[in-house]
Amino acid sequence: RFKKIRRLGALPGLTSKRPRSGSDLKNQLRSGKRSQYRIRLEEKQKLRFHYGLTERQLLKYVHIAGKAKGSTGRVLLQLLEMRLDNILFRLGMASTIPGARQLVNHRHILVNGHIVDIPSYRCKPRDIITTKDKQRSKALIQNYIALSPHEELPNHLTIDPFQYKGLVNQIIDSKWIGLKIN
């Protein structure tokens, strides 16, 4: 993980740790001139590692975004941001996107009252995301919410930390996308 972060820069969804500034300077000196191919490849790898996607999953999302109206890049980022694992991360119910994926896979999360165990589930506006009524599920989410730094919540999401409930208000606005892609 840390090799990826050193190579590609800060990836907030992968870990909360940041690369040291000295290692970044060494990387730039050693690398020389960056070709267009290298820049595109690094940006693609940033997307893959930040959202925890395989190459095939990313290609499917690019294909869907290409068919949709609007800018392909912007639509692609909206599709990725509306995934269930990413929304849990943005709500502060998980410290990282891989942690959110594990919560979903272990069946701790309900969407509109139904258990969802697919991290790539595409959330829609007016979806209500809650935890199971089991004590263990609530304790996990409570720990994450208590430990997470209370950053500004994107305006397409609302959270009720006492009921462990999140709500998707609308499709994400492009200014709230957490990853800077060239």
Swiss-Prot record:
GO terms for molecular function: rRNA binding; structural constituent of ribosome. It is found in: Plastid, Chloroplast. It comes from the Eukaryota. PROSITE patterns: RIBOSOMAL_S4 (PS00632), S4 (PS50889). InterPro entries: Ribosomal_uS4, Ribosomal_uS4_bac-type, Ribosomal_uS4_CS, Ribosomal_uS4_N, S4_RNA-bd, S4_RNA-bd_sf. GO terms for biological process: ribosomal small subunit biogenesis; translation. CDD domains: S4. Pfam families: Ribosomal_S4, S4. One of its GO terms (cellular component) is small ribosomal subunit. Its main location: plastid. Residues 82-143 form the S4 RNA-binding domain. The keyword rRNA-binding applies. Keywords: Chloroplast, Plastid, Ribonucleoprotein, Ribosomal protein, RNA-binding, rRNA-binding. Belongs to the universal ribosomal protein uS4 family. Part of the 30S ribosomal subunit. Contacts protein S5. The interaction surface between S4 and S5 is involved in control of translational fidelity. One of the primary rRNA binding proteins, it binds directly to 16S rRNA where it nucleates assembly of the body of the 30S subunit. HAMAP family: Ribosomal_uS4_B. This is Small ribosomal subunit protein uS4c. It comes from Iris domestica. The lineage of its organism: Eukaryota, Viridiplantae, Streptophyta, Embryophyta, Tracheophyta.
